[in-house]
Amino acid sequence: MRFDVNGFEIDKRQVSAEGADADPMAPLPLLVFSPGLYEVSVDTAISKTEGIKVLSDAPLANVPLDIQAEPTEKFIGVVQERVEDFLRGCATQRVLQPTGCPFGFSVQNRIDEPPVWSIVGQPTVQVVPNGASWAIPAADAVAHIEVDIRSLFDGSVREVSEDVPFTIDGTITVEPDGTASISIGGSANPAP
């Protein structure tokens, strides 16, 4: 929503007729002096672009410009950290199917004690533009479960220590106050 024109910061919500409800993806007409060379760029804590130069060389002429910002390394690092924190939180749940988490383990018998989860392979998170927000494309990760399973048939106990591959994805919405809301989803990968 914020961008620079020749070093002057503009917030789309301040110059758009819609104000705070401005659609980040909607075109924003601006009047400029002509002739003039203008450099438009984005440089915020979460996104950036290289400056794009545009020449306005005729009065009342429409000069279209489309810019797509990319996430900053710092923003990607924060998202990576939040995803890892989320998955570590999932691993603290001592159940076969951790609530709200992208991995789980199914058994046909009984378990003797609650399972112990760990994350042995964190995903490598990428952040990509997704319209007016950001997306986390699918990334592979691996959880590990240790649990004792008791057979309903003969009462024997089998110790299970198994890696559980899964995939995460997500969306990131930047609120008007500049905070980011990260929603993480995903699914268990089918067994080979």
Predicted features, each with a name:
Residues 1-192:
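Short loop/turn and low-complexity linker motifs enriched in small/turn-promoting residues
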